[in-house]
C-alpha cells in the first residue's frame, strides 16, 4: 500500500450519506463539447433532429473514428457554440425509448474477445471516450497503444461518493468490464482505497492507496506506479465507466446511468443519487437546495465546472454535483478579524483550532496578487516534483522548464489543491493546460 502524507482533506460541511437513492427525473440531457481536450467536432445532427440513444451526434475531425453518442433518445433542441465557434453543448429533450444496439457477448465469451473486437465495440458505441490519455488528458486515437491502463476505483475528493458502495451495486458488470479491458491490453491496474471491499479479476493488478487527498486522483496513481513522459502514454478511466463497458458487452446497449454524490453545505439532504450522464442540473437539484443564491458545480468543489447556461449539465467525467453558497460580499477588515468560522492551511485564523466542518462559499477571501512562496504548495503536493518552481514556470509560460519539472504527469485536477491554498489566488490549472497545449503542438 502507498500512503499519501502530504495533501489536504478539506473540512467541508455537507458530506453525503453513502446510500444510493433515485434522483429527480430529468427531461433534458446534453453532451458538453469543451470537456474533450483538443476535440474539433464534425456534426452529424442538426437542431430539430430526432435521435436514438447511442446515435452519433458528432465525430472528432482531429481523431477520425472517435464518435460521441447521444445519452438519451429525443429531440435535439440546441447546439450551443461559444467564441470561435467552439462547441459548448448539444442539448436533447428526452422522449421515447428508441436506441441503437451494438455487439453483445455471453459472459463466458468475454475472456476470449480479441483486442480488435473490443476496440470496435467501444468506438461504435462512443464508450471509447471513457478512456483518456496521460499526458495531455485527451481521448486516445483509435489505433493507439498505451503502456498500461489505469482503473480508478477510489475517490478522495471532498464530498465524494464511496466507490465501493456503487461498485458493489453493480458487481457483476464491474467484473465484466474489467475482463473486457484485459482483452484490450495486458497491463490493467486497478487502484482502490486501503481495505476497500472491491474484487478484481485475475489478470488485473491491484494497488492500494491511502492517506490525504490527492490519494484518490489518477495522476497520483500514475506517478507512483507507471510514470509517463513525452514518449510514454498511459490510459485511464473511472469505475463507473468500467461498469458501463461491462453492461455494453453483455447487453449490447449503451448504459448511461450515473450515481453521483449530491452534496455540499447548501444541499438539504446530501446523499448519492441515481441519474443519467449529461443530466440537466437545474432539474436534478430542484427542491434539493437551501434558500439563497447558490452555485451548482458539476464535479468537485476543488476542480469542477460551474453549471449554468449552455454548461448546465452533468459532465461526462463528473461523479459529483457540489453546491456552495454564492458569496459576493466583501468583508470589512476581514484580514484583521479572528475569523473563527474560516479555514486556512496556514493556521492564521481561529477556525484552525478544533476539528470542525466549515460552510465553504464561493468567496476567494482576497484579490489576485503575485505568487507568495511560503511553503503552502509543498504541504499539499505529494508527488516527487518541486511545486513552487513548477508553478512559477507555468505562470510565466516557460514550458521547457515546466516540462523538465514534471508538468507532463499532471492534469488540472492535480494542481487544484495548489490553487486552493495559493495566497495569490492564481488558477494554476489553466496555466497548466496552456503549457500542455503548447508542448503538444511544439514538442
Swiss-Prot record:
Enzyme Commission code: 7.2.1.1
Gene Ontology molecular functions: oxidoreductase activity, acting on NAD(P)H, quinone or similar compound as acceptor
Alphabetical GO biological process terms: sodium ion transport
Enzymatic reactions: a ubiquinone + n Na(+)(in) + NADH + H(+) = a ubiquinol + n Na(+)(out) + NAD(+)
Record flagged with keyword Translocase: yes
Source domain of life: Bacteria
Keywords associated with the record: Ion transport, NAD, Sodium, Sodium transport, Translocase, Transport, Ubiquinone
NCBIfam families, per database record: nqrA (TIGR01936), PRK05352.1-2 (NF003759)
Family to which this protein belongs: Belongs to the NqrA family.
Complex formation: Composed of six subunits; NqrA, NqrB, NqrC, NqrD, NqrE and NqrF.
Protein name per UniProt: Na(+)-translocating NADH-quinone reductase subunit A
UniProt source species: Actinobacillus succinogenes (strain ATCC 55618 / DSM 22257 / CCUG 43843 / 130Z)
